[in-house]
Every structure is written in C-alpha cells, then in structure tokens.
C-alpha cells in the first residue's frame, strides 16, 4: 500500500515507509528460512545440529536492512532536502501514515507481550535482554522500528502542513532512515553475542546447579559452562565431584540420572556433557 501512496503523493516519507515495509517482509522471509533450517537433524558434518542457522539468516536480513533500506531512505531524504518537490494528494499520505502507525503499534504491543510472557517478567527491557528467542526479539525490534518510522513520518507531515515547506518531507525520510539504521545496529549487537557463544542467564545457571546438587551421589559442582545453539536451545558442560570410593558402574548411573534430571527440569537443553572433577 505504501508504495502506491508514495506514487500518488510524490512523498519520500511514504517511499521510506514502503522500503521499511519491504525490509519487514524480507526479514520475515529470512527468519522463516533460518527457523526451518535450524530444525534439521544433526548429521556427520554438523554433529551439534543446525541450530545456529537462524543467526546467519537473521544477520543477512539485518545487513540488507542497514545497507539497503536505511541507506536509500537517507539518500532520498537528503536529496529532497536539497531539491524540494511538491507533495500532492496529502490526504492519502496522512491516511497511509495513520494506518502504518496503527498496525505497527498493535504488532509491537503483541510482540512485547509475547516476549514478556516467554520470560515470565513484566519488565520489557529485562525480558528483551534475557530472551534467547532471536526471532521474537527481531520481530519486536522490527515492529518498534515500524511504529517509530510512522510516528516520525506523521510529525514531518504535520510540520509540512503547518509551514508549507516541502523540505520537511525530506527531513522525515532522513530521520526514518536513521531510525532503521539504529534498529539494525541493535539487532547486530544482539546477534553478535549469540554468534560468539552467549551463555544462559545466571538464573538458569543457578537452577542447573540446584538440580545437580539435588541428584543423589553428586557431592559438588565445580564448573558449569553453557552456550546457545539456536533459538532457546543450549548445550551444557558440567563438572561434578562424586565419592572416590564409587565404582565405574555407580558413577555411570549417577551421570545418567543427572542428565535425566536436568533434561526434565530445563526443557531447553539440547546436549549435556558431564565430566568428573576429583
């Protein structure tokens, strides 16, 4: 719809809105591909599975959003500021921005609710920082980006209507482009931490230790290391101490019991490696 309104009105703000909508569509497509590929079974070449595929495809979409969508919006806005051009059919422009703001605001609200529900927290920022659901985090950022873009577009439209200065159409597109670039950087920072090997939260580590110590035969836990292997799924390496007098069979039973207890208590564990530290 936005591309049609952009053609009708000759507004670069609406063109930026259309580009932002295209970025949403592209990102959704890449997320779908990444999510699908991340569910592939482990094989001889990828023995820990394909969970990290979703990070790669999300990164591709974010790079396209930063270098294409944001750049074009900034360029179009800058050119309109230098060479102002008339805007026609302004009611269509306002209607397009209003619809974009309403739909993106609603989608943003739903994304935030889902994020907080998954993390069992009402604190939006903490939920965002702690969540390992990269697809939900990406959707939340995209919806917020769309909401802010429409808001900035409306502000630019109002100022243009009050002043009659066509340059504000360019300023609006410029700000939208900067907004898209900033949101892209936020996603890049989040993706970097997961690609580099981000560990689970301190609360999850605490739960792992509690479950281990509650397992019969485990005397202590000397080390816990974790790393996300995809959306919410992570691998766990835990070092435990047991009684020196135990036989190999008894130690094996303890390790098997510990793995079962951990998998039952924490559903997101994909692989567990238990090592003895005596």
Indicate residue ranges for each PLM-predicted region.
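Membrane-embedded alpha-helical segments in integral membrane proteins
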Residues: 1-11, 73-77, 155
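Transmembrane helix interruption/hinge and helix-loop junction motifs
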Residues: 8-13, 163-167
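Alpha-helical transmembrane segments and adjacent TM-loop junctions that form the membrane-embedded core
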Residues: 52-278
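Acidic (Asp/Glu-rich) catalytic motifs at the cytosolic membrane interface
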Residues: 9-40, 137-151
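Hydrophobic alpha-helical membrane-embedded segments
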Residues: 3, 9, 21-32, 99-112
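Aspartate-rich (DDxxD/NDxxD/DxxxD) Mg2+/diphosphate-binding motifs
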Residues: 35-53
């Amino acid at each position: 719809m936005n591309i049609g309104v952009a053609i009708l009105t000759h507004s670069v703000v609406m063109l930026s809105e259309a580009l932002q909508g295209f970025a949403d569509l592209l990102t959704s497509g890449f997320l779908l591909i990444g999510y699908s590929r991340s569910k592939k079974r482990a094989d001889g070449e990828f023995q820990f599975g394909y969970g990290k595929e979703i990070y790669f495809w999300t990164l591709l979409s974010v790079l396209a959003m930063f270098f294409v969508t944001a750049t074009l919006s900034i360029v179009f806005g800058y050119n309109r500021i230098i060479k102002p051009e008339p805007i026609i059919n302004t009611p269509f422009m306002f209607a397009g921005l209003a619809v974009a703001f309403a739909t993106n605001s609603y989608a943003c609200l739903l994304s935030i609710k889902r994020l907080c529900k998954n993390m069992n927290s009402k604190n939006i920022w903490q939920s965002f920082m702690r969540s390992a659901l990269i697809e939900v985090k990406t959707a939340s950022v995209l919806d917020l980006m769309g909401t802010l873009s429409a808001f900035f577009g409306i502000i630019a439209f109002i100022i243009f209507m009050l002043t009659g200065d066509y340059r504000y159409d360019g300023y609006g597109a410029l700000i939208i482009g900067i907004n898209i670039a900033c949101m892209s950087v936020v996603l890049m920072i989040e993706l970097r931490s997961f690609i580099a090997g981000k560990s689970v939260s301190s609360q999850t580590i605490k739960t792992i230790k509690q479950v281990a110590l509650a397992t019969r035969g485990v005397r202590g836990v000397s080390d816990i290391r974790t790393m996300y292997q995809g959306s919410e799924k992570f691998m766990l390496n835990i070092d435990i101490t047991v009684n020196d007098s135990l036989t190999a069979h008894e130690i094996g039973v303890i390790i098997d019991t510990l793995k079962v207890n951990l998998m039952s208590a924490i559903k997101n564990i994909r692989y567990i490696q238990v090592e003895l530290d005596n």
